[in-house]
């Protein structure tokens, strides 16, 4: 973690590319991009935390290139992420964007986040899609209404509607989890993505209305790999090396 922290602050360029392309792909440490200063101040809500978590769960070293909001709109970054967002993921000749895609790539390449059984593997991937396609959209609507549209005349009427849509999703999700620790057997990339999405509800108080889901998120946060990922992104915002 200390090495990663030093690379984050220095913006160190990646090592020179070896002549052997196969060696390059196999030995190149992945580089992800993250906010130079996260809008949440290091609460772990920026999407690079999901990618850090996946890399930590699979025991993979990585480097971080910090980018400013201005740099995110410049050609060099847009070549990696056409929508000018973070994170991006570079590994040799491969460049990816979108956290679902990045986490799936990591999970498929390294052991620890997808089951060996083909059917269980497919279900874990399904939960990844459910997290970002079904559960997250109304949560993002809530954040948009509260943060970016708080001064708009329609916000007061819109907020209750958005919160009801979130409750609908949580009411559907809660019985699927039931009393189990994770969504489908052992912890998987599906849980990683779902916990990451639900963490965005922490400040709203809605999650506490669903004790089973609240405990589920707490289990995810308690995982050592999540703790390492959280500390690494927090260090960027505090300027202090991770404690782990």
What does each model-identified segment do?
Residues 8, 23-158, 167:
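GST-like domain detector, emphasizing the conserved glutathione-binding G-site
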Residues 131-222:
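GST-like fold's C-terminal all-alpha helical module
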Residues 68, 189, 233-234:
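Short, solvent-exposed turn/loop segments enriched in Gly/Ser/Thr/Pro and often Arg
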Residues 231-244:
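Terminal-tail/helix-coil boundary detector
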């Amino acid at each position: 973690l200390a090495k990663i922290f030093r690379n984050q602050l220095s913006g160190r360029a990646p090592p020179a590319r070896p002549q052997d392309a196969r060696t390059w792909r196999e030995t190149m440490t992945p580089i992800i991009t993250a906010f130079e200063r996260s809008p949440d101040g290091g609460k772990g809500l920026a999407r690079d935390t999901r990618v850090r978590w996946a890399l930590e769960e699979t025991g993979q070293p990585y480097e971080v290139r910090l980018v400013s909001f201005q740099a995110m709109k410049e050609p060099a970054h847009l070549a990696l992420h056409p929508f000018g967002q973070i994170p991006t993921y570079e590994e040799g000749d491969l460049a990816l964007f979108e956290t679902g895609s990045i986490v799936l790539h990591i999970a498929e390449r390294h052991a620890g986040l997808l089951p060996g059984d083909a059917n269980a593997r497919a279900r874990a991937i399904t939960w990844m899609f459910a997290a970002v396609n079904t559960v997250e959209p109304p949560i993002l609507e809530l954040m948009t209404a509260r943060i970016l549209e708080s001064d708009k005349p329609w916000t007061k009427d819109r907020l209750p509607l958005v919160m009801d849509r979130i409750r609908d999703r949580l009411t559907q999700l809660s019985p699927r989890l039931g009393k189990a620790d994770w969504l489908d057997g052992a912890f998987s990339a599906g849980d990683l993505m779902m916990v990451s999405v639900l963490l965005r509800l922490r400040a709203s108080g809605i999650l506490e209305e669903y004790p089973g889901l609240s405990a589920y998120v707490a289990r995810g946060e308690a995982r050592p790999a999540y703790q390492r990922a959280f500390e690494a992104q927090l260090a960027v915002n505090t300027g202090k090396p991770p404690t782990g």
